[in-house]
From Swiss-Prot:
The protein's assembly and partners: Component of a multisubunit complex.
Protein name: Pentatricopeptide repeat-containing protein CRP1, chloroplastic
GO MF terms, alphabetically ordered: mRNA binding; single-stranded RNA binding
Transit peptide: 1-64
Family per record: Belongs to the PPR family. P subfamily.
Organism: Zea mays
Keyword Chloroplast included in the entry's annotation: yes
């Protein structure tokens, strides 16, 4: 009998012999593997599994017609090994890259000879070890095993895969696994939702709102009762997705059953409310949970409230937050000072910002590149892009080196004002200083060239990004899909979308809205409708923006009936029809010379409490001019002023056109 097939020797681990040196045919030898302390000698088994032909046979989707007799004898010699020994061996093999192939071969060996049950528990243990170490994507692992290992997959296995996918920051894979659980009528556990939310929260970009709503709907459908940690993750996720109303509802639900979310979730919600300008609600939440409660506010909580005051340009209240922090013994950090500096910059108080920088240094908080990037962003938003050079000089005078974030803001500043030469100079400078561009850098640069009409250069930059160590993200693909759509390069659009999915990226609401917009503007209405249907099939809810893009596309071509059908579909999906959509519908009727229907939309607005804006009245005047009802144009203009709507340049131009035609007709 070959040495590799000898039965295991039942010896204490310190007397365990090593397998003969020549017993393997693979580079992954058992002597190079750390074997766990055990009453059993696994060396012969590992030597056998290290053979490439054996490993290929075990992991093949098609089982062999017959199993060699020596393998049967080897398996029989391990029939008395208890389950916990197999688990210990598997964990140890999974701990090293060198022994990982043996772990892959061991599982089907155990399955083939029925040596350990349940096998899914072993596979779940291996998945957990790999996800903790981050050395292998879980879906790749699943594909490496024959379907017979778990066919159909068990809930334990799917939940383990879901957790591993989340740990690997692959929410798309995790969502697919959640769908598989539902397809097989398995009940996901709370941990599955927590892992999935963690993967969404651990990304740089905010979670996609449609995905969160889908996830919450699935959780409610399963009738699982969230615990405090899961409520906290849900509140944090919706807050980061800029959906404070949904986060507030979740907070109320948690409190109704006596649960208190973690302080970081409350802080995230305060920050979201402040960002939305809802400072009164942010203040109330801060008082309820921190000042009136048992939890003492920390720096991050104060910063969240401070962000709201900066958002509404309430400098007095912002300065009071700093005073209160001092009175409560809470030390301000760099983010605190950067928010105040940002407030001063946005108010045009550059000298006050410089004084605060000095105070910051006096308090032992050295300003970083981030603080200066906030100053630069403030000037950018006020249109003072030329001050970018002054900020850079001040930064260098303070001994602070620009980092990636600062360069990203600088590139964005130049890009917004079509100073593409300066943007490329900043890009090249950061590379010269050894700072590698990240996905934000590339996205900003590519988008700036797209908007500046430099489409060829944008495509070149995208290719450079592909070749770099920074793979394109969802936002990158959205930018390129929009660029190719504007050029009506439809094969390129489809290829870009396919490539995006192949990279494991999930098309988000912006992706679908972009597709609907570019297809609609080019008259490819079938493709636009198909995108909406595909989105619904993926469990995502079309946004009002998407419907508006399609209504507007129909309106531009005077296809009023099609536009009206889209509005009806929008209402059927439970979405509120906005002024923007109704204005586009008026335009569609106007282009189709259907003035009566155009004015019926105006009546619909009034009956439903929607206030017509200047675009509404301007579009109606344009419709009247198109059907040569010039005498009614001044009447609509007068009605606009009476309603309190201030006319703009286009409205006045429409009035002049109407009066000009009236005068011409009278002369004639």
């Amino acid at each position: 009998m070959p040495a590799s097939l000898l039965p295991p020797t039942f010896l204490p681990h310190h007397l365990r012999r090593l397998a003969p040196a020549g017993c393997t045919t693979s580079s992954v030898t058992s002597s190079s593997v750390s074997i766990p302390a055990s009453r059993y000698d696994f060396e012969p088994l590992l030597a056998y599994l290290s053979s490439p032909s054996v490993s290929a046979s075990l992991t093949s989707p098609s089982p062999p017609a017959s199993v060699p007799a020596p393998e049967h004898r080897l398996a029989a010699s391990y029939s008395a090994v208890p389950s916990h020994e197999w688990h210990a061996l598997l964990r140890d093999l999974a701990a090293s890259d060198a022994s990982l192939p043996l772990a892959f071969a061991l599982l089907p060996f155990l399955h083939r000879h029925r040596l350990c049950f349940p096998l899914d528990l072993l596979l779940s243990s291996l998945l957990h070890s790999l996800s903790v170490s981050g050395r292998l994507l879980p879906h790749s692992l699943l594909l490496s095993f024959p379907p017979s290992l778990s066919d159909p997959p068990s809930p334990l296995l799917l939940n383990s895969l879901l957790a591993a996918s989340a740990a690997a920051s692959r929410p798309a894979v995790a969502l697919r696994l959640l769908s598989l659980l539902r397809e097989h009528d398995f009940l996901p556990d709370l941990a599955s939702y927590s892992h999935l939310l963690a993967s969404l929260l651990n990304t740089r970009d905010p979670p996609d709102a449609a995905l969160l709503e889908r996830l919450l709907g699935d959780l409610r459908e399963s009738r699982l009762e969230p615990d405090a940690p899961l409520f906290s993750d849900l509140i944090s996720a919706f807050a980061r997705a800029a959906l404070p109303d949904a986060a507030l509802e979740l907070l109320a639900s948690a409190q109704a059953i006596g649960l208190t979310p973690r302080s970081n979730a409350v802080t995230a919600l305060i920050s979201a409310l402040g960002t939305a300008g809802r400072v009164a609600e942010a203040e109330a939440l801060f008082l309820e949970f921190f000042l009136a409660g048992e939890i003492k506010p920390r720096t991050r909580a104060y910063n969240a409230l401070l962000k709201g005051y900066v958002r509404i340009a309430s400098l007095k209240n912002a300065e009071q937050v700093l005073d209160e922090m001092s009175q409560c013994g809470v030390a301000p950090d760099e983010a605190t000072y950067s928010l105040l500096v940002d407030a001063y910059t946005r108010a045009g108080r550059w000298e006050s910002a410089r004084i605060l920088l000095k105070e910051m240094e006096a308090d032992g908080v050295k300003p970083s590149s981030y603080v200066f990037s906030r100053i630069l962003a403030g000037f950018r938003d006020r249109g003072d892009w030329q001050k970018a050079f002054a900020v850079l000089r001040e930064m260098q005078a303070s001994g602070v080196r620009p980092d990636r974030h600062f360069y990203n803001v600088m590139i964005d500043t130049f890009g917004k004002y079509n100073c593409l030469g300066h943007a490329m100079d900043a890009f090249n400078k950061m590379r010269e200083e050894g700072i590698e561009p990240d996905v934000v850098t590339w996205n900003t640069l590519i988008d700036a060239h797209c908007k500046g009409g430099r489409h060829d250069r944008a495509a070149e930059l995208f290719e450079e990004m592909r070749e770099s160590n920074c793979p394109p993200g969802t936002t990158t693909y959205n930018i390129m899909i929009n660029l190719l759509g504007e050029q009506e390069h439809w094969e390129g659009v489809e290829a870009m979308l396919s490539e995006m999915k192949e990279q494991g990226l999930v098309p988000n609401i912006i992706t679908y809205t972009t597709l609907v917009d570019v297809y609609g503007r080019s008259g490819r209405y079938k493709e636009a409708i198909d995108c909406i249907e595909a989105m619904k099939a993926d469990g995502l809810k079309p946004s009002p923006t998407m419907y508006h893009a399609l209504v507007n596309a129909y309106a531009q071509r005077g296809l009023a009936d099609h536009a009206l059908n889209v509005v009806k579909a929008m209402k059927a999906d439970g979405l509120e029809v906005s002024i923007l959509v109704l204005n586009s519908l008026i335009n569609a009727f106007g282009e189709d010379r259907r003035v009566v229907e155009a004015f019926s939309v105006l009546q619909f607005m009034r009956e439903n409490g929607l206030r017509p804006d200047v675009i509404t009245y301007t579009t109606l005047m344009k419709a009247l001019i198109r059907v040569e009802q010039f005498d009614k144009v001044p009447v609509i203009y007068e009605e606009m002023i009476t309603s309190g709507c201030a006319p703009d340049r286009k409205a006045r131009a429409m009035l002049r056109s109407g009066l000009k035609y009236i005068k011409h007709m009278r002369v004639a």
